[in-house]
Amino acid sequence: AAGCETTLLIRKDRVLSGWDRRAATTLTRELKRHGLTIVTRTHVTQVDTGANLGATVHYTRDGEDGDHTVYGQIVLAAIGRDPITDAGWFSSSGIARDDHGLIVTDQLGRTSVPGIWALGDVTPGHALAHRAFEQGITVAEAIAGLDPKPVDDATIPQVVFSSPEAACVGLTLDQASARDDLVEVSETVYPMMGNARMLMSGSGGSISLVSGASVADPDTPVVLGAHIIGPIASDLIAEAEQLIGNRVPLHDAARLIHPHPTFSEALGETLLKADGRPLNTR
């Protein structure tokens, strides 16, 4: 959308509706700063295309009367995908599906029919390529008679390649707070403008880290979730994934040194702040 007037129609009440609310607010601010028009709580009712280039999109808004329209030379519909598992031969195969038509499997990809395996977008969970890759490895090793570990959905990062990028992995503050097996749950927020490389880029963003300890080990807090808005967030999230997946104690994670001046320093300073030792921020 660079250099174009862009309108974003969203069905929910905010962008990134299933993500951390603070991250969603930060991304919304940055998108608007780039000139995007964001309209929430919308329902597209019709798209009119004519002989000329472009289309007129008709939509309604929750709580408002009447029909709204917006014209665009290019219209992109990004509303998700449904599995194609309703064919007659599939129904007669005996393979179990859930209420959404997704194939039900165990942790290793086995379906309800012996010898048939399933992975990727046709199974429940996030429809992400890197998740499917890992599922493929698990299925192949299981078929080969090895002893693979099941895919841990809690450590699968999600990325939105917007400008700036958005990335998250693990739990949000609300999700962690609702868990009975976690204690001392807290959220640490780091404004990316405190990072030297961010100042050079002229961009904006934030990092939110959710930390807490298990009931079984209440004196050892770990990182439970990370939510990043900013340049190369898609790369920064990989370090957070390692911390979460390997349950690195927060105090140890905060001791890791990041090169200067890099965007990765922002994550390092967020860890320091979460550990009670803030450096360039309160």
Predicted regions and their residues:
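Flexible, glycine-rich terminal cap/loop adjacent to redox cofactors
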Residues: F161-T172, S177-R282
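Short acidic, glycine-rich loop/turn motifs
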Residues: Y59-E64, S211-V215
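FAD-site-proximal beta/loop scaffold in flavoenzymes
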Residues: T69-I143
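Glycine/Thr-rich phosphate-binding loops of Rossmann-like dinucleotide-binding domains
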Residues: L16, I84-A87, D99, H126, ...
